[in-house]
Design a protein with these regions (language model features):
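Soluble catalytic regions of membrane-associated enzymes that act on cell-envelope
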Residues: 195-545, 553-565
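Membrane-interface soluble catalytic domains
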Residues: 201, 514-634
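Short, function-defining helix-loop hinge/capping sites that tune catalysis or transport
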Residues: 37, 67, 282-283, 494, ...
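Short, hydrophobic/amphipathic alpha-helical patches that form generic packing surfaces
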Residues: 54, 100-103, 224-229, 617-620
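Transmembrane and membrane-interface helices of multi-pass
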Residues: 2-220
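Residue-level recognition of alpha-helix termini/interfacial anchor residues
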Residues: 36, 141-146, 411, 441, ...
Length: 634
């Protein structure tokens, strides 16, 4: 029992407690920044001031949502009784502890996702069959997150013990007045402003408080992100262009391979490499501290059709396969989890299956993990091989799946049994947090600035052995090998790989040993380009819908699209950053201005206008077709 708690009127007690919770949210914002300072970079005192001021505005909304029941019940007459007060104290601690827990978890998770957790992100948890192992690993590796959360809980307990209300009696009129006033203030608080002529405070409003668009996640909290994105999974149609001919002239997703000739029944093997970042490659990174960890992939890349500037379309594993197989870019939420996931997509596996191909997908994770098995079936994959089919739990890494080297050996052995022609994809797992390699080979591979670099080398060596084992197969020369990472690593050492361009730079290349295709291109590659480029190599002669480009055609625009909080549009040498309303807010020559320090928006307005116009045509085609289920050619 506290002998001298501070006692106030019930209304003032609520105000003081909420104010102290707002202070804790600001502290959690600082903690969030500290854990991700390599991503956000240094902030000046002025920048911090506006982040905290803007953050307070967003936190008021989130904290009012979190404490709505506590506020209303406390101010009702039953809330004056001692028993009810204890119940509401517990409610106050528990609900605010959950809100602060979300902020703490996101301080670690943000590096993987590059955006705050949203309502749609929570659905991704259903796809993990190994949730227990993942949670155990998270508890151990990110112990400081839980330590910070326990400190926040301690602060909440101190608040309810020291800031208490008197048991005052009021007449019915006073109760009604206080309750109505509180309710009205809460309604305005939920909106984030006092004007009904404006929209409620949204995620895009955070841009007012930062200089760099990539720092908006510092302003709003994770609870705010979740509350504001509930029910917002639906896309909205755009009408930037009312003239269909004008729209199609700027961007037409209905594509067809160029040239004439019979369809080439070549085998297709797609290798999706977990978290392989351009930073670990010597092809475009000259820093020897980080560029020496995928020697085989680099050597194979130089024998392939490749570029120094290739990009992921998203930042999650679950976003990679729709981009690679279906030429679908990343958008508000992962396509696999969206309401549009049942849309008709004439994907690369489906096209080839209709041509008589054997189709397969290999993923060493527990069967069904991340919803890949179901999605693969929708995309035309007839044969799925996961941890269950591998059948040897002694090779399980304890968290994500079968170690890459034995699973790649299993892939090679199984691939040799398939009838030709075949389409097959493998998705590696070992270079995933916590970036472990088998103990027996720990000393075989070099260490880097972060454990993921050793994991890169381990998987890279597994890929070398895989290609050694199949290079004498009779079908090898008649096979198109596509190598792409799913996304970049959450841990980057060099500043140029931590900005909004670098965090999407991955290897994407085409190795075709039986054709004279090898060479370095000066074009921009992205994952959505894989499908149209493979179909061009095979001389597929039917129209299809793709939101990438045929890299072998000089007629296609040289662009890439990805989402970093908001969309960004890469076009040749330029990067255009867009706000939530798809208006350009930053223009950079990203190839020479590697840290994106010189905004050319005002000095090159014509270029900015051109890129914005191209992007708006692209996004209008994409979203309107997604809503109308028009991803196939009738």
């Amino acid at each position: 029992m506290i002998k001298n708690p501070y006692r106030y009127s019930p209304w003032l007690t609520v105000v003081l407690r909420i104010s102290l919770v707002l202070l804790l949210f600001s502290v959690s914002r600082v903690f969030f920044y500290i854990q991700n300072r390599d991503i956000f970079g240094p902030l000046s005192a002025t920048e911090w001031f506006w982040v905290l001021v803007g953050g307070l505005r967003f936190d008021v909304v989130a904290v009012l949502y979190i404490n709505l029941l506590y506020i209303l019940f406390t101010l009702l007459p039953p809330g004056r009784h001692a028993g009810a007060t204890r119940v509401f104290d517990v409610l106050f601690v528990v609900t605010n502890a959950i809100g602060l827990l979300l902020n703490c978890i996101d301080s670690a998770y943000y590096a993987f996702n590059l955006k705050r957790i949203a309502w749609g992100s929570l659905g991704e948890l259903k796809g993990f069959n190994n949730a227990t192992e993942l949670l155990s690993s998270f508890l151990v590796r990110y112990w400081y997150v839980w330590a910070a959360w326990l400190l926040f809980i301690g602060a909440l307990v101190l608040i309810v013990r020291y800031v208490r209300s008197t048991r005052q009696k009021y007449n019915a009129h006073t109760y009604v007045d206080v309750f109505l006033l509180t309710f009205i203030l809460c309604m305005f608080g939920f909106r984030g402003n006092l004007r009904y002529s404006t929209r409620p405070l949204g995620l895009n409003d955070a841009g007012k408080y930062v200089r760099s668009p990539q720092n908006v996640a510092l302003v709003f909290s994770t609870p705010f992100s979740i509350f504001r994105t509930i029910g917002e999974a639906r896309l909205e149609k755009y009408s930037y262009f009312s003239d269909e001919k004008e729209l199609e002239a700027l961007y037409n997703p209905v594509q067809q391979s160029e040239g004439e000739g019979p369809f080439r029944k070549m085998n297709v093997v797609v290798l999706v490499l977990e978290s392989f970042s351009e930073e670990a490659s010597s092809v475009s990174n000259t820093n020897t501290t980080t560029n020496r960890f995928m020697p085989f992939v680099d050597s194979l890349r130089k024998k392939s059709f490749y570029t120094e500037y290739s990009f992921a379309n998203g930042k999650k594993s679950i976003e990679a396969l729709p981009s690679i197989w279906g030429s679908i870019p990343s958008y508000t939420q992962p396509y696999v989890l969206s309401e549009y996931s049942s849309n008709k997509i004439y994907s690369l596996p489906l096209i080839l299956r209709d041509k008589g191909y054997h189709t397969s997908f290999f993923h060493g994770a527990p069967n069904g993990s991340m919803g890949f098995q179901s999605f693969a079936n929708l995309m035309g994959i007839d044969h799925y091989y996961g941890k269950d089919e591998f059948g040897d739990n002694s090779q399980f890494d304890g968290i994500w799946g079968i170690w890459d080297q034995p699973f790649l050996a299993y892939y090679s052995k199984t691939l040799k049994t398939f009838p030709q022609p075949f389409f097959s994809t493998i998705f590696t797992v070992s270079s995933h947090d916590p970036f472990k390699v088998p103990k027996e080979v720990e000393n075989k591979y070099p260490s880097g600035p972060h454990p993921i670099f050793k994991a890169f080398s381990y998987t890279d060596d597994g890929l070398r052995k895989f290609f050694e084992s199949i290079k004498h197969e009779p079908w090898f020369q008649n096979t198109i090998f596509v190598i792409s990472a799913d996304h970049t690593s959450p841990k980057c050492d060099l500043p140029e790989f931590r900005n909004s361009v670098g965090v999407f730079r991955i290897p994407v290349f085409f190795y075709v040993p039986g054709m004279d295709l090898a060479g370095k291109s000066d074009r921009v590659f992205q994952q959505t380009d894989i499908m149209p480029t493979v179909l061009q190599i095979m001389q597929y002669d039917q129209p299809y819908v793709s939101f990438g480009k045929n890299l072998l055609s000089p007629k296609t625009k040289d662009f890439a699209v990805n989402k970093y909080e908001n969309y960004q549009y890469i076009y040749g040498d330029f990067l255009l950053k867009l706000d939530a309303g798809n208006k350009g807010v930053g223009l950079y020559r990203y190839k020479t201005d590697k840290l994106l320090e010189k905004n050319l928006l005002e000095t090159e307005p014509d270029t900015a206008q051109l890129l914005e116009r191209n992007f708006k045509a692209y996004i209008q085609q994409f979203q309107n077709r997604m809503i109308d289920d028009r991803f196939t050619v009738k």
